[in-house]
């Protein structure tokens, strides 16, 4: 009997390590594939890379930037996706005017730190806003995130920043989704807030929203058991 495939899409500066708890729990039942974007600098080309590594039909899970990549997969090949899970992500284009310039300035400032001081130094500035405040005392968690960031280069960081700053709106994509969809958000995610995920759930026909308590943006690592349980229920419902 052919096993179902689940494709996992990491977020900004992340790799398979961000999914390790979920891979460990799900790989006994599903064929799990983690996409690698290389040094691509657009969400569209990241989605193309993910599609090239995937079988004809699969379930799709994206976290943060990976959620936006998942929406580009849905824009271009919705017929291949059996189910969709979007975690701590967004769907809007970069805003115009001062808000958009502020976002670009913030991202470019971190890129400057990466170029001048290294990726781990940049990570030490970036990570505190990515996790629940109480998790900042979890040295193993913080070190695992910093190690993951350290495996990337400033060039990859620059490419991914460009991809995010040039992101398209995916509102029409959400409205057109017809597969079982799970939307997950850490309640204390200050980067991709719960209100945004509530709006995504409203826009997506039949979507279910799962709120993960005591978690910020890095929900797969901060609360791995809760995230895994939500994914298992979503996958089982689609079987």
State each model region's role:
Residues 1-47, 59, 63:
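Conserved HGGG/HGGXW glycine-rich cap/lid loop of the alpha/beta-hydrolase fold
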Residues 62-66, 70:
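Gly/Ala-rich beta-loop-alpha elbow adjacent to hydrolase catalytic centers
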Residues 75-76, 80-117, 121-124:
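Flexible "cap/lid" loop of the alpha/beta hydrolase fold
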Residues 98-99, 117-176:
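Conserved alpha/beta-hydrolase catalytic His-Asp/Glu region
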Residues 177, 183-185, 189:
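Short beta-strand/loop motif that positions the catalytic acidic residue
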Residues 179, 193-202:
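Short alpha-helix in the alpha/beta-hydrolase fold that links the catalytic acid
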Residues 198-217:
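Catalytic histidine neighborhood in serine/cysteine hydrolases
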Residues 215-228:
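Catalytic histidine-centered segment of alpha/beta-hydrolase-like enzymes
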